[in-house]
């Protein structure tokens, strides 16, 4: 591990946690790694970073803070694969070795820190840092869409009233569509009539220019034109009647909805004049009761 300087650990501490961890990684000369896939290195970096936070919190000088990081890294490396009894022995030996770097108070604080963190959770540290782990990680990137900003409460309405207005709007739209269907049907039948008559006239036209149609042929052509006109008119009337009944049914539904419309909630009375208006019926009632008693 690269030897940290007092200035280096000071820079790490003064940064926010994410930036501080990144600065510590650079000072340790570690290569960049995937925090999610390389959990071992991520936890090791967390442990070293937390040792800096602990030392500064206990008032260690910056020189001793750098030594605490070195102490932590050596302890984790030397206890790899050891039993907890061996780990306690190694911790005691290292504390004695570092007596020249820390005063008695800081040495006791360091001993207490590792007993309550490293030794207490020793099996977990060994499992994470001492064994190769097979990582099977699936990463999914989700796009979170924020809900739209709600309108001011004063512009809102009662839920039942809103549902009623939506139902009325749906019926109104359906009625308008029915009326549009009638206009489209008239136009379609008109075009069909013109096309049918044009075909009939073209078929009955004389072969030679200037040739006059016989009376029988002319009567047949007129009958055919009248028959075509009557068929299309009958279809138009039938469709119009159907649409008229459908429109009347929609109007009846709207009328029924409006008769059963929910009563809107009146706005709260906030002004002095409004409060006076609201109190008038109560005052009148009290006056009548007083007169009755007399």
Curated annotation (Swiss-Prot):
Highest taxon of source: Eukaryota
Annotated Basic residues bias: 283-294
Species of the source: Homo sapiens (Human)
Stretches for region Disordered: 259-294
Segments crossing the lipid bilayer: none
Record-given protein name: Uncharacterized protein C8orf74
Lineage: Eukaryota, Metazoa, Chordata, Craniata, Vertebrata
InterPro entries to which the protein is assigned, alphabetical: CLAMP
Family annotation (PANTHER family): COILED-COIL DOMAIN-CONTAINING PROTEIN 189, SIMILAR TO 4930578I06RIK PROTEIN
